[in-house]
C-alpha cells in the first residue's frame, strides 16, 4: 500500500519531498497574511474538503497555492491574496534571513518561533546555541567573557582597581566582549545560508546592530529586528514565567536585573543608531503583526527587484 492509502491523507508534492496536507499549516499561512484565525481555519477546511471531493490524492505545492490564491480572490480577500502570493514568490526565489535581537527576557525566542511558523521558515537558531559551539573552539583563557552570561561577562574583564570595576561602562564593555566571538558564528551562518539559498531565523541577545558586520545592514534579504520592554514590571514577570517552565534560575536574573536593563538600553540605542526597527514586545500577537508588516515591506522591495514572472508561483 502507498503512504497516502495508509494514512488516508492528501499528499502535497514539492521538488524534493512529499508531505501530508495540513489544515494547521495552511491556517497559519493565511493568518500571517492578515486573515482572522477563525476565517483562516474555515477556508483551510473548505480547501481540504474540495480536494477530497475531487478525489485528489496528490497535489503539487504550486497548484495548492494557486487554489488558495483564487479562493481568497473569490471571497473578496484581494489584499490578503496579494500578500499571500508575495510571500510565496519571495520565499521561493530568495533566501530570507531574519535576525531577532534583544536583551535577556524580552521574548526573542517566542517571537522568532511565531514568525517561523507564520512564514514557513523551517529553521530557528538561538544565539545561545552558537555561543556553546564557540566555547568549544575558543579557550576560556583566551576569551573568558565568552564563558559568562551576557550580564555577568564584565566580571571576567581585567581591571586596574575596584573603583573602575562595577560600573555601567564595564558592564557594557563586558557585554561587547561576550558578544564579539558569538557574532563570528552568527555571521558564518548568515553567509552559508545565503550561499546555499536557505532561509533561517536567528534570535538572541548577541544580535546587536553596530557590532554585527556592516554589510548585513544593507542586504535586502537580511532583516534585523530588535525587541524591547520598557516596563520593568513586565520584564521581571517574563523571567518569573520563564522560571516556571524551565530550569533557569529566577534569582540569578532578578539579582542582575539592573545590568540586564542597561544592556537592553544599549541594544535599543545601537538599533536606533543603525536604523533597525525597535518593537515593544508587550503583546505577542501585536509584536508578531508588527514584525510581519516590516518583513512584508522588505518582501515588496525584493519582489520588485526580481525579474517578471509569467507564472503565479
UniProtKB/Swiss-Prot annotation:
Highest taxon above the source species: Archaea
Biochemical pathway: Thermoadapter biosynthesis; cyclic 2,3-diphosphoglycerate biosynthesis; cyclic 2,3-diphosphoglycerate from 2-phospho-D-glycerate: step 1/2
Sample GO molecular function, one term: kinase activity
InterPro entries assigned: 2PKG, ATP-cone_dom, P-loop_NTPase
EC top class, as a word: transferase
E.C. designation(s): 2.7.2.16
Keywords: ATP-binding, Kinase, Nucleotide-binding, Transferase
Needed co-factor(s): a divalent metal cation
Catalytic reactions of this protein: (2R)-2-phosphoglycerate + ATP = (2R)-2,3-bisphosphoglycerate + ADP + H(+)
The keyword Protein biosynthesis is annotated on this UniProt entry: no
Cross-referenced PROSITE patterns: ATP_CONE
ATP-cone domain span: 8-95
The protein's role, per its UniProt record: Catalyzes the phosphorylation of 2-phosphoglycerate to 2,3-diphosphoglycerate. Involved in the biosynthesis of cyclic 2,3-bisphosphoglycerate, a thermoprotectant.
Similarity-based family: Belongs to the 2-phosphoglycerate kinase family.
Protein name: 2-phosphoglycerate kinase
Lineage, highest ranks first: Archaea, Methanobacteriati, Methanobacteriota, Methanomada group, Methanococci
Amino acid at each position: 500500500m502507498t503512504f497516502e492509502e495508509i494514512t488516508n491523507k492528501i499528499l502535497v508534492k514539492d521538488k524534493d519531498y512529499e508531505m501530508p496536507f495540513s489544515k494547521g499549516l495552511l491556517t497559519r499561512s493565511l493568518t500571517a497574511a492578515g486573515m482572522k484565525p477563525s476565517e483562516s481555519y474555515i477556508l483551510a477546511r473548505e480547501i481540504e474538503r474540495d480536494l477530497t471531493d475531487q478525489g485528489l490524492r496528490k497535489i503539487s505545492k504550486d497548484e495548492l497555492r494557486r487554489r488558495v490564491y483564487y479562493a481568497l480572490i473569490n471571497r473578496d480577500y484581494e489584499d490578503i491574496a496579494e500578500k499571500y502570493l508575495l510571500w510565496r514568490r519571495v520565499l521561493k526565489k530568495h533566501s530570507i534571513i531574519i535576525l531577532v535581537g534583544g536583551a535577556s527576557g524580552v521574548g526573542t525566542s517566542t517571537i522568532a518561533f511565531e514568525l517561523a511558523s507564520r512564514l514557513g521558515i523551517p529553521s530557528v537558531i538561538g544565539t545561545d546555541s552558537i555561543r556553546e559551539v564557540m566555547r568549544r573552539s575558543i579557550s576560556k583563557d583566551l576569551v573568558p567573557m565568552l564563558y559568562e552570561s551576557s550580564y555577568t561577562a564584565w566580571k571576567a574583564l581585567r581591571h586596574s582597581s575596584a573603583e573602575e570595576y562595577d560600573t555601567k561602562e564595564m558592564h557594557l564593555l563586558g557585554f561587547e566582549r561576550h558578544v564579539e566571538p558569538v557574532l563570528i558564528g552568527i555571521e558564518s551562518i548568515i553567509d552559508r545560508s545565503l550561499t546555499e539559498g536557505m532561509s533561517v531565523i536567528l534570535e538572541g541577545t548577541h544580535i546587536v546592530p553596530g557590532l554585527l558586520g556592516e554589510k548585513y545592514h544593507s542586504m535586502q534579504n537580511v532583516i534585523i529586528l530588535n525587541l524591547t520592554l520598557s516596563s520593568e514590571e513586565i520584564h521581571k514577570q517574563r523571567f518569573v514565567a520563564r522560571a516556571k517552565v524551565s530550569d533557569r534560575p529566577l534569582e540569578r536574573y532578578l539579582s542582575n536585573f539592573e545590568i540586564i536593563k542597561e544592556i537592553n538600553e544599549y541594544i535599543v540605542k545601537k538599533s536606533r543608531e543603525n536604523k533597525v526597527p525597535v518593537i515593544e514586545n508587550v503583546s505577542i500577537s501585536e509584536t508578531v503583526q508588527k514584525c510581519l508588516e516590516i518583513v512584508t515591506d522588505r518582501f515588496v522591495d525584493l519582489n520588485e527587484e526580481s525579474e517578471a514572472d509569467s507564472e503565479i508561483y
